[in-house]
Every structure is written in C-alpha cells, then in structure tokens.
Amino acid sequence: MANVLKEKMYDELLSATCRILKLGSHDYRMTERNLLSKNPKFPLCDIILKLDYAYNLEYLLSLWEHVTKQEPRFVFKNTGGAVSMSCYLHAPVKAEGHHAVRECNILRVNECLTVRMSDIVAMKPSTFAVFTKCIIRRNRDETYVVEFVAFGPENESEYISLLKAIFLKKCSMGKQHLESNRFCQGLRRRSSHVLEKGQLGSSGEIANKASAVVTSQESINQFYEKEKSFLSGVKFSRLSERHCRVAIVSICFLLALYFCYVLLKKTPTPASGPVV
C-alpha cells in the first residue's frame, strides 16, 4: 500500500511541477521510481530554467510540502551555460550551497543555492503577501542572478482592513446584481402569466412594460407601413386629378372641332361659273 501511495505521490508531484512551472518535454529530466526507492535523497527531477521568466516558486514549494508532509528543498546551480534547479524531497546527500538566501543571489560557475520554504517566508514582507516568484537573470561573463520577487503590505492590520472592505464591497455588489436578476425574472414570469390569461389592469401594465422592448420594433414597423400607404394614396390622388384635367381639356377640344365641322357643312357654298 505504501508503494502505491509513493507512486501516486511521484506522478502527482511531477505533473504539478510541469503544470505550475509550464515546462516543456525538453525542459526537465526526472529520476526513475526504482532509483528513488533505493535512495530517496536523490532529486525527483532536474529542471533547466529560462532567463527572465517568472516562476511561481513559493506556490510549488507549498504544494510539495502539502503533498509530502515534509520539507522539500530546491537547489539552484550554475552549470556555466544555464541555471538548473534540482527538486529534492529530503535534504540532498551532500550539502550543496551554504549561502544565505536573499532577494538577489549571484551564482558563479558550479555554485549552488539551496532554498527551503522557511527561506521564502523569511524574505516575505508580511504574512499575507502574495506568492513569491523566482526570476533568473544573466549578470556578466558566466555568472547569473537568482532573484526572488515578493509583494506584500508593510502594515498587516491595514492590509486586513483593506481586504475586508474590498470583500464587503464585492459582496454588496453581488447581492445587488442577484436581486436585480431575481426582479427581472419575476417580472418576466408575471408578464408571461398575464399575457397567457389575457388579464388587464395593473398586471396588464406590468406585462406591457415587460413586453415594451419586444413590441417596440413591431410598432415602429407598423408606423412606417401606415406612413408608406398614406403617402402612396396621396400620390395616387394627385395623379388621378391630373389625368382628369387632361381628359376634360381634350374632350372640350374635340367638341369644339366637331362644332366647327357641323357649321361649315351647313353653310352653302357659292356657285362657280362665268358672269353674264
């Protein structure tokens, strides 16, 4: 049963480390389970750290400490071309690095720096500070700087009161939002109930208010249709009046021509011939 738990712990620590540090398949090298079972003071994994990248070191250390119920240690080492980090479940076999952990630590070639959770807590400006991050920077020549960045308040009581104020403000805003959502849902339910039963009065006014947004577009479309039909009727009436006038004038002209033709036909024409 203990071996099964160790295997689960092994897989959990490896997956959590890759997830938290966002490691690729070529960024780390893990130690086999059989070798760890024979000598548990070997590192579980060795990681090649990138430059100018913020690693969430305190979060990973806290997770390892919670899973293993022990005091894990991360050892930083300058290999000459990069900085590696070896993750140990226990203290390493040989003491590597006796330097005190500070915010900025200079590592020369083959020098090591061992970091524990107590070292991180000692660097934090306050108990309620955010998780400390680790950044590797190139210094000069073949030296590197291991920098630990921690943010936190200098006054704990002021920080706690500020957190309470922010939390209460968010809670009040959340309650107002929840109440407004409940009111809108109740209004929709009442309006749908009124529309189904066809009731009028005060409940009908609520239904009209609730459905005003839905029917506004329909009313606008109906208004435009009425306006269009009215304008087309006015245009048609104007055209019909113009056509009537033209027809009357043409009829009068034809009647005048016909009257002239009749008069000319009834008038006798003088006889033509030689005068005696």
Swiss-Prot record:
Keywords: Host membrane, Host nucleus, Late protein, Membrane, Phosphoprotein, Transmembrane, Transmembrane helix
Post-translational modification: Phosphorylated.
Subunit field text: Forms a heterohexameric complex with NEC1.
Principal location: host cell
Protein task: Plays an essential role in virion nuclear egress, the first step of virion release from infected cell. Within the host nucleus, NEC1 interacts with the newly formed capsid through the vertexes and directs it to the inner nuclear membrane by associating with NEC2. Induces the budding of the capsid at the inner nuclear membrane as well as its envelopment into the perinuclear space.
Topology term for the membrane: Single-pass membrane protein
Organism encoding this protein: Human herpesvirus 6B (strain Z29)
InterPro entries attached to this UniProt entry: Herpesvirus_viron_egress-type (IPR007626)
Subcellular location(s) per record: Host nucleus inner membrane
Transmembrane segments: 246-264
Family statement: Belongs to the herpesviridae NEC2 protein family.
Superkingdom as given in the UniProt entry: Viruses
The protein, known as: Nuclear egress protein 2
Gene: NEC2
Cystine bridges: none
Endoplasmic reticulum among keywords: no
Perinuclear space side: 1-245
Keyword Membrane attributed: yes
Pfam family, one: Herpes_U34
